[in-house]
Design a protein with these regions (language model features):
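Active-site rim/loop-helix segments in enzyme catalytic domains that contact anionic ligands
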Residues: 1-113
């Protein structure tokens, strides 16, 4: 096992959209969990605009709040399967902007989780 994938770590995985952590890093996250690390996922957005075209195509079209609810349920289910904790900062997407207030939120997140 490589030094990177070892137990007793506290890891934060940042994800732009709700499903990115699974499709981009799911295997690594699973290996970290299997090795005994604790992983917390931080999604910047629900991917409600650019990552949800199939949801927007439904008839009748769902509201933005409904799209976010669906995406939240999907990310919670994926997190439960992986055995991680998760939160969504709901920064919105398209564009996803990180200004001073949001940077402060991220600093607080690091202080809280101590990765």
């Amino acid at each position: 096992m490589s030094d990177f994938i070892r137990g007793d770590r506290r890891v934060i995985v940042f994800s732009a959209h709700a499903a990115d952590f699974c499709s981009r890093a799911g295997g690594t996250i699973a290996r970290l969990i299997d090795a005994g690390s604790k992983v917390h996922i931080v999604d910047f957005s629900y991917g409600e605009k650019c990552e949800s075209p199939a949801l927007w195509a439904r008839d009748p079209a769902p509201s933005l709040a409904e799209i976010k609810q669906i995406r939240a349920a999907e990310m919670d289910a994926a997190a439960a399967i992986l055995g991680v904790t998760i939160e969504c900062l709901d920064f919105g997407d398209s564009p996803l902007l990180i200004g001073p207030e949001r940077r402060q939120q991220l600093l607080e997140l690091f202080r809280r989780h101590q990765p």
